[in-house]
């Protein structure tokens, strides 16, 4: 079998914030992609605005560098568990991975997840211990922890012999030993060439390409990205689209342009052959998971199974009093088109129709996954509202199962007690607790996914912002029972108008506020949170009554406390089942699902009435069975019994519901 020794295809995988994008920056700079006098931003691969703001990678990205005559195609992947679907699908394009591990934190939940996916595809692994220049770094211990993780995941002997490289991506240096002098990334380049296998040379076989990523360009439309598994592709070639999930489906299409990756650019080429990662244009309806084939062999390539969503929320048309004021796209048709268009690029997302034409059920991998979608739509000009996130349950053997998360917490020892207590109340189970290192202690919990909803903000408060919490989906387990709801309740406006200093001053006596003076509010809008756990209705638009009478002294100036500005994730954690978040291009507001206070009052009383009625009928049935059993056992209701009259009265009472 022949191999293309001029190509290597690799993916950089790791837990969030372990330095993947910074490592790619260093590889790009030292491969000669940039001019010597060229100013290059940090984390140059994170080109998306939200990625730069949040400091995380959301979308996987392709680049390529040249070293010693070999082209190295590199895929930078997300590290956050919510975007694990991006990692799963791009692993089909590569022949090996570089696993990045923080020299202080060691293997984290997402490290285990991405490593497991790599093992399932039998990909060779290079382990890079990054951030060795951190003062608290412990690289030798981290190496042992990585090997323990390999054994836990059932790695073969060949995988256990994986090479280890030590690096400081920020400084742009690497070495094969800790005590050697490190001056560049050359040791990592050499390890990639020596250890990652070259793709198979199969350019003379039938053409096949699996689409793993979709991009979009206003000029050329949809762009399919994937690795050519076999054969050769030329411009204007006619190929067939088939899909392993659609038996019998095929469509003949024509390739317009072919691009290969060079640095941060895409270079147009006339043809490309097996082993190359390419981007193609000209196919209007191309999707992730499609296989492009020649006419001779139309057998589709298997696409990797993507993990199922664990969380859902309803996206619906905005029906608040302020609806349509600033939004560009506000109708249910526009909302539907945008959500279903997202399915073409996000394989982890699910969108379902509901009983209402104005509402859609959207399921994802976590709060961050869905909040990034919301933020993207908001910036595009969409106006809509979303409900409280709900966990997706499963029924297995007629029993209710729920998703379980593995949570890893690094925190100062003084906060450990409070965290164990809080997560215990949320049905969390402490699995491991490591000895303190550098003043920090690591805790590992297994906890229902619904137990984490609303906890992250509470965690940051309890640890005074000094704790680190990471979670990743573990498995489904039997339902753990009820979990206590939030302690704080909503402060709700019962009128519409402009918030005044006088009204806000009175309202802030009840709790912290979300709105400031001069902001427009409407009836049913949540304007703050009360620490007492009881929902409160206030008027924040109330003005001080003016009279002709003047006090002997001047009025004191009113002092308002700072407004509590919630992030979108914090708002999603805060809201209850009867609340929504109104999303607009300019801002978002928390509101009640039923805006009218009178309608909410009637709805609550109606629920109480049905509850009381259910209790009455249950008690009536119970009493009927109990009395009949007692009277029949002792034959109290014989014709001569003194209780015959009582039985008649009892039956009449029960039968008439009195």
Predicted regions and their residues:
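Structural and coupling elements of P-loop NTPases
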Residues: 1-609
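Low-complexity, intrinsically disordered segments with a bias for serine/threonine
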Residues: 642-648
């Amino acid at each position: 079998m022949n191999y293309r020794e001029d190509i290597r295809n690799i993916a950089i995988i790791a837990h969030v914030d372990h330095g993947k994008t910074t490592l790619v920056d260093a590889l790009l700079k030292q491969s000669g992609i940039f001019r010597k006098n060229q100013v290059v931003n940090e984390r140059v691969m994170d080109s998306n605005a939200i990625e730069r703001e949040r400091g995380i990678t959301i979308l996987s990205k392709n680049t390529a560098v040249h070293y010693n005559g070999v082209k190295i195609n590199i895929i930078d992947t997300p590290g956050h568990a919510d975007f694990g679907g991006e990692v799963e699908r791009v692993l089909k394009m590569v022949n090996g991975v570089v696993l990045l591990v923080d020299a202080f934190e060691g293997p984290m939940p997402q490290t285990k997840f991405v490593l497991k996916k790599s093992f399932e595809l039998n990909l060779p692994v290079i382990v890079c211990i990054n951030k060795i220049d951190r003062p608290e770094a412990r690289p030798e211990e981290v190496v042992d922890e990585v090997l323990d993780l390999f054994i836990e995941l059932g790695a073969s002997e060949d995988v256990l012999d994986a090479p280890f490289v030590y690096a400081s991506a920020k400084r742009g240096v690497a070495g094969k030993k800790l005590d050697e002098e490190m001056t560049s990334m050359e040791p990592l380049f050499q390890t990639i060439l020596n250890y990652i296998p070259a793709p198979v040379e199969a350019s003379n076989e039938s053409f096949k390409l699996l689409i793993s990523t979709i991009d979009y360009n206003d000029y050329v439309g949809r762009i399919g990205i994937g690795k050519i598994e076999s054969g050769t592709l030329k411009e204007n070639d006619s190929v067939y689209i088939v899909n392993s999930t659609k038996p019998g489906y095929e469509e003949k299409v024509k390739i317009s342009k072919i691009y290969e990756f060079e640095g941060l650019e895409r270079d147009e080429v006339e043809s490309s052959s097996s082993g190359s990662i390419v981007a193609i244009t000209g196919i209007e309806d191309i999707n992730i998971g499609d296989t492009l084939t020649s006419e001779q062999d139309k057998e589709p390539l298997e696409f990797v199974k993507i993990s199922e969503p664990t969380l859902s929320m309803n996206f619906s048309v905005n029906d608040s009093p302020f609806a349509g004021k600033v939004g560009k796209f506000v109708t249910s048709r526009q909302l539907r088109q945008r959500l279903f268009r997202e399915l073409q690029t996000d394989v982890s997302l699910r969108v379902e129709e509901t009983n209402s034409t104005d509402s859609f059920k959207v399921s994802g991998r976590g709060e961050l996954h869905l909040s990034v979608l919301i933020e993207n739509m908001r910036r595009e000009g969409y106006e809509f509202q979303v409900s409280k996130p709900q966990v997706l349950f499963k029924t297995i053997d007629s029993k209710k199962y729920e998703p379980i998360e593995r949570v890893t917490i690094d925190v100062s020892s003084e906060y450990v007690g409070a965290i164990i207590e809080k997560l215990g109340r949320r049905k969390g189970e402490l699995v491991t607790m490591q000895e303190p290192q550098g003043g920090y202690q690591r805790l590992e919990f297994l906890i229902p996914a619904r137990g984490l909803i609303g906890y992250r903000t509470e965690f940051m408060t309890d640890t005074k912002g000094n704790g680190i919490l990471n979670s990743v989906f573990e498995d489904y387990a039997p339902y753990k029972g009820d979990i206590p709801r939030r302690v704080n309740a909503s402060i709700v406006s019962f009128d519409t108008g402009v918030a005044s200093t006088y009204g806000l001053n009175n309202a802030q006596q009840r709790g912290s506020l979300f709105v400031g003076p001069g902001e427009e509010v409407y009836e049913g809008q949540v304007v703050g949170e009360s620490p007492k756990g009881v929902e409160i209705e206030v008027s924040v638009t109330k003005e001080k009554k003016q009279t002709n009478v003047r006090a002997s002294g001047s009025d004191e100036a009113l002092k308002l406390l700072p407004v509590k500005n919630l992030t979108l994730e914090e708002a999603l954690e805060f809201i209850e089942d009867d609340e929504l978040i109104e999303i607009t291009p300019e801002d978002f507001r928390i509101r009640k699902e039923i805006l009218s206070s009178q309608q909410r009052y009637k709805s609550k009383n109606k629920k109480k009435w049905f509850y009381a009625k259910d209790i009455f009928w249950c008690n009536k049935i119970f009493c009927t069975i109990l009395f009949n059993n007692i009277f029949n056992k002792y034959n109290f209701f014989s014709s001569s019994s003194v209780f015959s009259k009582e039985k008649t009265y009892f039956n009449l009472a029960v039968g008439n519901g009195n």
